[in-house]
Structures are given as structure tokens and as C-alpha cells.
Amino acid sequence: MIFNQTEKQEKEYLQQVITTIHDTINTTSTSVKEHIDTLQEYKDYLWSNKDIDPHEIRSMRESILNHFALGENVIDKRRRLSKILDIPYFGRIDFQEKKDKSQVSPIYIGIHTFYDFKQKRNLIYDWRAPISSMFYDHELGEATYSSPAGEINGTILLKRQYRIRKGNMEYMIESSVTVHDDILQKELCSNADNKMRNIVTTIQREQNRIIRNENAAVLIIQGVAGSGKTSIALHRIAYLLYAQKGQISSKDILIISPNKVFADYISNVLPELGEETVPETSMEQILSNVLDNKYKFQTFFEQVTELLEKPTQDFIKRIQYKASFEFISQLDKFILYMENNYFKATDVKLTKYITIPAEFINEQFKRFHRYPIRQRFETMTDYILEMMQLQYNLTVSTPEKNQLKKEIKKMFAGNNDLQIYKDFFEWIGKPEMFKTRKNRILEYADLAPLAYLHIALNGNNAQSYVKHLLIDEMQDYSPIQYKVIQKLYPCRKTILGDASQSVNPYGSSTADMIQKAFATGEIMKLCKSYRSTFEITSFAQKIQPNNELEPIMRHGEHPKILPFKNTEEEIQGIADLVNSFRNSHYTSLGIICKTESQAKELVQKLQIYANDISLLSNQSSAYVKGIIITSAHMAKGLEFDEVIIPQTDDKNYHSNIDKSMLYVAATRAMHKLTLTYSVSSPSCRFL
């Protein structure tokens, strides 16, 4: 006999579950009030009895802390229950264990576990629970899952999916595949949101394997455009917080994000899944912090802009060289060279009668070779003075000790990071590979190697408080940057991106290069593209072919390339497309230009036609819904119902980096894509 066989029975059961959740929320609210009242009683007692003995104070302090902790737990439970009221669950499997064929357990799956103490059973299982993995991994028939007690084998007899909104069941589908196509198609056909959403209802088998991978110390996810890699990485974080509760918390995780807009765009996913948001930072901030924020430097955004607007072959060569493994090898050789050649010991007159010989000082420099060079001076000073104490019964003052340390430090010719970095390029015979800009501004590509040298000389100051590091847009970071990350963050890592979407092809990394940089790592691939229609994905594939990409069979309009007589008519044409968007059922439109300066110029030109257009720039900190004009660089990782790409002529899009930008722009579109250009310029070679 199937439990809740009909849709009517399922709807009745849903209301029973919601009623039980309501009752539990009311109970927890009463419990919260009781804890608050008790804490107030303790407070009043302490105020009115100031002469109580220390033993009683200690006892009361323990009671207060205990009540406070219990109260926080109850508040957290109430918060979680409130989150599942609207959508208690989304799936169900009926599982029969092999060892007990007399019992069939209906497993309802939702965002959170809900245990009913009256019935003494789970009414809802958390999607991250071991038993819930079968919902994503198995069809009807034989199935298995890993539990703390070992592998559990059995049979899935029934599989259902529900769409529940605001406590009402809109429909129910019997499902015989991993996630029913109807559900997935309905989700994919919906409009883009102003924030990334959780995808627990539509997680696919290959995505689930990535989410639940607990073995890889470094997990590298190569995911094609629209494969959901960022969302999957965030669901992976939520899973790890659940599976390793007590070992890791939200504050122990760090996300390296490409920009503030993207960080804002993804900020809702973890809270939707019942977890706190995690700290985020940027690669630039990390590298600058290593260097004590001493140097002014070109940002990554500024580097990309220069490559798009005024590239020179010398600039490209400098970036390419510093993104090579040969460069890292040469740096390592130079660090060894400094060890053997940059310390020149001299005699030091300690007192009127005692001189420390240069040879003895040099011996101590070698004695402490396990220490980073700049950490050695303190240890050497202490050891030398200890020897002086033993041999001459000499005791020195703190100022005298500091003076000796200063003398020893001066013997090392590498106390200035920037100078030794310049020395390095002279040493390898490539002085032209280092160039500062006006006002001594460093090029972006020099920031990581400078930090690498600094760490080699000063010690790595590992950030041990971070227990899991998530790096998004992995392709935009070079091997030397990953080497710095390896030294700073010895924790587990999830690294994700797409080699086809680099906005800096001259200094980018593939999954294989990242694996080589870390000398370890498991590469997992996401090849199915879900974001765009089949027609848009096929169009983008012509710009930048990727044989591994599998488009989903969701059909829509063919992308349009609209020619105009001149620039003025092109602007008018874009304004007409904006008006058409306003009259459509779509809610987000991205007008994606090659560069930010082009985006700013277009905003000015379109102002006479519309006042509801927002510019998303490098200075922006939040993603806004509606009509947005932005650059391809800033649009990376975002998605829109409709996309317009202006100025798609050969004058504007002709280089390798231009091609990458065009591909990124085209793959932002979910449902509709239009490209415009003026016929006064030749048509684009990539279209």
C-alpha cells in the first residue's frame, strides 16, 4: 500500500505537515520567552543581591551562559522552521531497505530536516542528508547510499517531485529519472532574478557528485558557460557546513570573488539554504595585504581595459611571461641565489675588547637555514649573544642587542622587496620584463610575484583560520597567483571556472595548469549548459567552439544580428529594442559592451530615449534588476532574460581577447540575444 497514493492525499498530508510546523514554531516561541524571562530573573537577582559570595556568582554565571546558549539554539530552530513553512519539501522517495523488505519508508526531502517529537520520526529530511542523495543519484529500482553505519542497499519504489509555493501544492509529478525534465524545463524557462537562486530542486547527478565530494583536498571544477558551477560550489559549501558540523562554520570559509557586484549577486544562496553568508575578498586585496599595502598597483580591471583599448606587444609579453611556469622556476632559482650570494658577513665590534668575526656570523646564517632569511636575523642575534654570554660572561642591554640585529640585517642585500624584484629581472637577463607606470604604479602582473618573493624571505604567515577556500573565475588567475594562495591557505579548496571565459587570455590558467600549480587536485567537469536556449548556445559555440559543451534542448528564438546604416541609426535601433523589452514578459535586459568606456558612452546616448537604464561599472557594489548597461568583464557570472550586444563590427571585435569578451557577452543571455552593428565598419570575423 503506497503512503499518500493520490494527489488529494498528498495535498492533505502537506497541510498536516504545515500545521505541525506551526505548532512547533509556537512551542519554540514559548521556549524563547521562558529563556528570556529566566535571564531577566537572574539579572534582577544580581542587581538586588550585590553581596552574594563568589561561589554563587560563579554558579549563576554558568547558569546564565547555559540559558543563553539554549535560547540561541531555540531561536535558530525557530528561524529554520519559519524558512520551510512556504515550501516544506520538494521531493519524495519511497525506499525499501534490502535487509528489511517488510517496511517501506517514505522520505520527504526539503531545505531542512523537521523532526516531529510526537510522532518520533523525521517528517522532512534535509537535502544534504545521506539518504537524500538517492533522490539526485538514482532512478526507480536498486539504490544505495552511504550512512555513518556503512553502505545501505535497497530499492526505490516511488519517486515524486512537487511544486509547492506559499504552502499550496501547485502540482505533483511522478518521476522516473534523476530530475524530471518537466520540472527542470519549467525552472529554466522562468525569468532571471536579481540574485542567484538556490537550485536544490533541480540538482543533477553530475552536480550532486561535486557537491558531496569530501575526499578531494583541492577540487577543481571546469564548468562550461551556464553549467551552474558557481551555484553548485555554493551548494557544496552548504553541504560541507552540514556534513562537517562542529568542525567547520561559515566564518571558517573564505570566497575569493571577482568583484563586489558578483559577490552581491550570489549573496542570497547560502541564506536561502539556511546557512550564514561567508566572508569574501579579492585576489588583489590578498596580494596587497601580503605586501603590507605598501604599493600602488594597476587593478585587474585596469589591466583588462588596457588590453582591450590600447594593447602593446611589450605589455602582452610581460603578462604572458609572468603567467608561465618557467617564470616561477626562475623565481625559485633566484631565491636560492639570494640565499647563497646576498648575505655578506662583516666583523662587528660588540665592545671595546670584543669583536664578532664575520666568519662566525656567516656560520650562524647557514646554521639557521631552515628559517626564512629575514626571520633569521632575530634568531642569529639571540644565538650570538648567548655564545658571548657563555664565552665572555657578557650581558648586553636591549639597545645593544637591537644594534647588533640592525648590523646583521644590513649585511643582507635583499631588504627591499621592489629592489630585489628588479634585481631578479637583471639576473635573468630580461630587464625589459619589469616596468612601472607613472607615479611608481606597479603593473597588475607584478603584484603576485612580488608577494611570492616577500613570502619566501619573510615566511608565509599562513591564514590557518580559513578551513575552506572557494575561488571563483579560476581562469582569470595565473599560476604564480595560485602559488601564493597555496602558501597562504594550506586548507582544503574548491576552485571553479571556465577556460573559455577568460577576460585575460594572456595571463589565464586552465584546470590542468591549476592542478600543476598545486601539485595535487581532482578535476571534475560540468559539460551541460543549462542557462541559454539551444539556439543561443549554438550561436555562442560558433564564436568560441568547445567540443565538451552539451547544450540543453530548450528551444527559443534564433539570435539576431541587426545591421544599421550608421552609428546614429544603431543607437535608435537599440532604443527600439529596449522598448520591445519593456512590452515583453521578460524582467531583465543586459546591454553588454566590450569595454566600460563604451558602456558609459552608450548610457549617455540612450538617456534621451529612457531614464530607467542603470550603468553597472567597476565602481558598482550591487546588482540591480531591470535594464542594465555594462561591460563584458563586469557581466561575467551574471545572467539576463535578454541581451543586446552593440558595436559587433570587425573594428571593435577582432583580437583574441575581443573574441573572449564577445563569447562572455553572448553566453549571458537566457532567452533572447540580439547583436547590432553599423555597416560603416566591416562585419565581425567571429560571427
What are these regions (language model features)?
Residues 1-200, 204, 208-212:
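Extended, charged low-complexity regulatory segments
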